[in-house]
Amino acid sequence: MCGNTMSVPLLTDAATVSGAERETAAVIFLHGLGDTGHSWADALSTIRLPHVKYICPHAPRIPVTLNMKMVMPSWFDLMGLSPDAPEDEAGIKKAAENIKALIEHEMKNGIPANRIVLGGFSQGGALSLYTALTCPHPLAGIVALSCWLPLHRAFPQAANGSAKDLAILQCHGELDPMVPVRFGALTAEKLRSVVTPARVQFKTYPGVMHSSCPQEMAAVKEFLEKLLPPV
């Protein structure tokens, strides 16, 4: 990893997948509640593009209200998983700032904002949506898997002006018992009020629960190939 990572705590021990060629683009992917970046680094290595660097940071360990205050990797506190559940606004905003610092570190190392995709699964996907929509830098797009938009009532007003050009791939399992697919559909509807509607893809997968599947990973690869072509 080139550059000073000490000022970006999430980078110091992040799981990374290096490109086989000169890296001209980056995907920052955020794991779900209770997980680490390693599992998604492994998954993304199966669809890697040779000129893309994949960065999968680990969330800090904090008490999570939803899980009886058990301490576990979590980007912010979770009180519930429904559109009207109370939210940890301060924690969400702080986590987003930490991800923006990671984005800016990559930019300083020569990867322009429009060659950076932010993505994530479940809570990580939620944070990637919030961060990208409020980011002052015009990113290439978002990969949002099995997730929702945090603080959704603040949008579209809370979005940065450059957010309207973001490309978004949103995927959801139709049998998801944790984050119901209906919540995903409401999120897609809200996203179309924030970005150019035609730039939001919402794909659902029959028989899939709160997890990924090969068809979804193929869709992610196709999305990244179009958004981050070789230069």
From Swiss-Prot:
Catalyzed reactions per annotation: S-hexadecanoyl-L-cysteinyl-[protein] + H2O = L-cysteinyl-[protein] + hexadecanoate + H(+); prostaglandin E2 1-glyceryl ester + H2O = prostaglandin E2 + glycerol + H(+); 1-hexadecanoyl-sn-glycero-3-phosphocholine + H2O = sn-glycerol 3-phosphocholine + hexadecanoate + H(+); 1-octadecanoyl-sn-glycero-3-phosphocholine + H2O = octadecanoate + sn-glycerol 3-phosphocholine + H(+)
Residue numbers with lipid attached (S-palmitoyl cysteine): C2
PTM sites of type Phosphoserine: S82
Keyword field contains Lipid metabolism: yes
Main enzyme class: hydrolase
Enzyme Commission (EC) number: 3.1.2.-, 3.1.2.22
Any one GO cellular component localisation term in the record: cytoplasm
GO molecular function annotation: cadherin binding; carboxylic ester hydrolase activity; lysophospholipase activity; palmitoyl-(protein) hydrolase activity
Entry keywords, A to Z: Cytoplasm, Fatty acid metabolism, Hydrolase, Lipid metabolism, Lipoprotein, Palmitate, Phosphoprotein
Reported tissue expression: Expressed in various breast cancer cell lines.
UniProt GO BP: acylglycerol catabolic process; axon guidance; fatty acid metabolic process; prostaglandin catabolic process; protein depalmitoylation
Record field: transmembrane: none
Active site per database record: S122 (charge relay system), D176 (charge relay system), H210 (charge relay system)
InterPro entries linked: AB_hydrolase_fold (IPR029058), LYPA1-2/EST-like (IPR050565), PLipase/COase/thioEstase (IPR003140)
Cellular localisation: Cytoplasm
Regulation: Inhibited by compound 1 or (5,5-Dioxido-4H-thieno[3,2-c]thiochromen-2-yl)(4-(4-methoxyphenyl)piperazin-1-yl)methanone.
Physiological role: Acts as an acyl-protein thioesterase hydrolyzing fatty acids from S-acylated cysteine residues in proteins such as trimeric G alpha proteins, GSDMD, GAP43, ZDHHC6 or HRAS. Deacylates GAP43. Mediates depalmitoylation of ZDHHC6. Has lysophospholipase activity. Hydrolyzes prostaglandin glycerol esters (PG-Gs) in the following order prostaglandin D2-glycerol ester (PGD2-G) > prostaglandin E2 glycerol ester (PGE2-G) > prostaglandin F2-alpha-glycerol ester (PGF2-alpha-G). Hydrolyzes 1-arachidonoylglycerol but not 2-arachidonoylglycerol or arachidonoylethanolamide.
Assigned protein family: Belongs to the AB hydrolase superfamily. AB hydrolase 2 family.
Protein name as catalogued: Acyl-protein thioesterase 2
